[in-house]
From Swiss-Prot:
Protein species of origin: Nitratiruptor sp. (strain SB155-2)
Name of the molecule in the record: Bifunctional enzyme IspD/IspF
Protein function: Bifunctional enzyme that catalyzes the formation of 4-diphosphocytidyl-2-C-methyl-D-erythritol from CTP and 2-C-methyl-D-erythritol 4-phosphate (MEP) (IspD), and catalyzes the conversion of 4-diphosphocytidyl-2-C-methyl-D-erythritol 2-phosphate (CDP-ME2P) to 2-C-methyl-D-erythritol 2,4-cyclodiphosphate (ME-CPP) with a corresponding release of cytidine 5-monophosphate (CMP) (IspF).
Site feature location: Positions MEP for the nucleophilic attack: 140, 192
Keywords assigned by UniProt, alphabetized: Isoprene biosynthesis, Lyase, Metal-binding, Multifunctional enzyme, Nucleotidyltransferase, Transferase
Listed Pfam families: IspD, YgbB
Length: 373
């Protein structure tokens, strides 16, 4: 059994990236970048375990893609790594950033082969440009540009990261502890993705698949007294409202389920559970806006939505255009890509008895095409 665990750091907010989509959720073929990098590593070496850090809200989504250990990331890279190290049981750990996807097998193998030589094995490259420090030109042959992955003694790394200082990588933390670091030559292809312009350097990545992803949503709410009726985010004049934990906007709820279904991200109850008082009586427009923000951050583009409201009463026709305008504002997609229909059940069933309203939705998504940047 291997004595080495792989830790991949992917909990960042991509604040410097300059796009709505997070770096770890750029799609390569039909895989998000974090999964592509994970599979690239696991194809190279039989790790004892793989631990991936993720933003807390995204952990349920990561778990739908793989069976690796997913842990909660933190505000800093260092704290995220400490969280991951709590799950590491092996004497050695290989740490890398998901934002450095073009990992070269020969570099990884060289790192692993040299693991007994120091507390940390570090790949580096030398700068090709002139280097100036404080207005003084220095010998660039004495300068090392540090890369990941880096292999460390697990116990020493844990100790190094708890010195009360913030470090930008494992090697600097271990050096500050007075432990030995061993450098090996890395590879210039192992670029780190920080800014959107860096995408042009990552020629190892396959462009996103042209796959269309389609999801369906269905929701039902019963009528109740003493509540206002909301559909598609607008108030509908009626003598009853709908019962529910939130404002019970049945149309928006069906649409959220369709969007999440297309992304493969579960359903509205997983994302906004009714056991959470945060969502008590909440305006469903806020839930839809958060869903749209999340889908964009995870690399999806909303291509089209189709929504059917099933109600005996009130009559929906007079409000359809206003509803479409509301959805246009919430989804932030062109007006003509939103289709809204209304029907009755001809007095059949609970809808026909005027006991409640149902809604059905279909959503089509595609992947954000970063190759066109």
């Amino acid at each position: 059994m291997s004595d080495l665990t792989l830790v991949l750091l992917g909990a960042g907010n991509s604040s410097r990236f300059g796009l709505d989509v997070k770096k770890q959720w750029l799609w390569c073929g039909n895989e998000p970048l974090w999964l592509y990098v994970t599979n690239r590593f696991t194809d190279m070496f039989p790790f004892h375990d793989v631990v991936i850090t993720a933003h807390p809200k995204e952990i349920p989504f990561y778990k739908k893609f793989c069976h690796h250990t997913i842990v909660k990331g933190a505000d800093t890279r260092q704290q995220s790594l400490l969280n991951a190290l709590e799950m590491v049981k092996t004497p050695y750990v290989l740490v890398s950033d998901i934002a450095r996807p073009c990992i070269q097998k020969e570099v990884v193998q060289k790192i692993i082969d040299n693991r007994s030589k120091a507390a940390c094995i570090v790949p580096y490259i030398q700068p090709a440009d002139t280097v100036v420090y404080k207005n003084e030109t220095i010998d660039r042959n004495e300068v090392k540009l540090i890369q990941t992955p880096q292999l460390s003694s697990t116990d020493i790394l844990r100790k190094a990261l708890t010195q009360g200082k913030e470090f930008t990588d494992e090697s600097s933390a271990i050096q500050a502890l007075g432990e030995k670091v061993f450098y090996i030559l890395g590879n210039r292809k192992q670029h780190k993705l920080t800014y959107k312009e860096d995408m042009k350097l990552l020629n190892c990545l396959q462009k996103p698949s042209a796959t269309k992803r389609i999801g369906n949503g269905l929701d039902v709410h019963a009528f109740c007294e003493d509540r206002k009726l909301y559909l598609c985010g607008i108030e509908i004049p009626y003598d009853k409202g709908l019962a529910g934990h939130s404002d019970a906007d049945v149309a928006i709820h069906a649409l959220i389920d369709a969007l999440l279904g297309a992304a493969g991200f579960g359903d509205i109850g997983e994302l906004f559970p009714d056991s959470d008082e945060t969502y008590k009586d909440i305006d469903s427009k806020k839930l839809l806006c958060e869903t749209v923000r999340l889908l964009r951050a995870c690399g999806f583009v909303i291509e089209h939505v189709d929504l059917t409201i099933v109600a005996q009463n009130p009559k929906i026709g007079p409000f359809k255009e206003k509803m479409k305008e509301s959805l246009h504002d919430l989804l932030q997609i062109p007006y003509h890509l939103i289709n809204l229909k209304a029907t009755t059940t001809e007095h059949l069933g609970f809808v026909g008895r005027n006991e409640g309203i149902a809604a059905m939705a279909t959503a089509t998504l595609h992947y954000f095409d970063w190759s066109e940047i």
